[in-house]
Amino acid sequence: MCFSFTYAFAHPLVDEAILHLEKPYVYSATGPDSFDCSGFTYYCVDTVYDFTIERTAYKQGYDESYYKINSIAQLQVGDLVFFDTKRDKDKCDHAGIYIGNNQFIHASSAGEKVTISEIRGTFYEGIFSWGRRLI
């Protein structure tokens, strides 16, 4: 799969996230050398902005301090994205950062590293829960 980085320097959160591509997935890790999914979003936000977000994917996804985006089509570069990988009632157990062009960056337990994945037309489209706009 080929990814385009033409947008990469347009958003500071994406710039930070891209620096960590290929770093290993480790459950409960919050960086900078390894991450789990919410540790990755937590670390990137904390590094770039003057605020922190909740630590777990569930708490990040349900934090009503930030605008909720219910449609993939409404996502903007830098939005956090949340997925229901377990397909259970909480609807929010995986987190990543939308980087544009139908792609998001995340610490993937399946891929065992920080990676970029597409949303539409993939497994992730079917389990997309919502996004949150931080700024």
Question: Model-found features: residue ranges?
Answer:
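Alpha-helix initiation/capping motif
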Residues: 6, 30-34, 120
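...with weaker cross-activation on analogous glycine-rich loops/strands in unrelated enzymes
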Residues: 11, 51-114, 135
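Short hydrophobic/aromatic patches on the structural cores and recognition surfaces of FHA
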Residues: 40, 96, 131
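A short, polar/proline- and glycine-enriched secondary-structure boundary/capping micro-motif
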Residues: 115-119
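Intrinsically disordered, low-complexity
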Residues: 1-24, 73, 123-135
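Residue-level detector of conserved, well-ordered beta-strand and adjacent loop positions
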Residues: 18, 28, 54, 82-84, ...
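A generic alpha-helix preference that emphasizes hydrophobic side chains
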Residues: 14, 37-38, 93, 128
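Catalytic cysteine-centered active-site loop
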Residues: 19, 23-77, 126-127
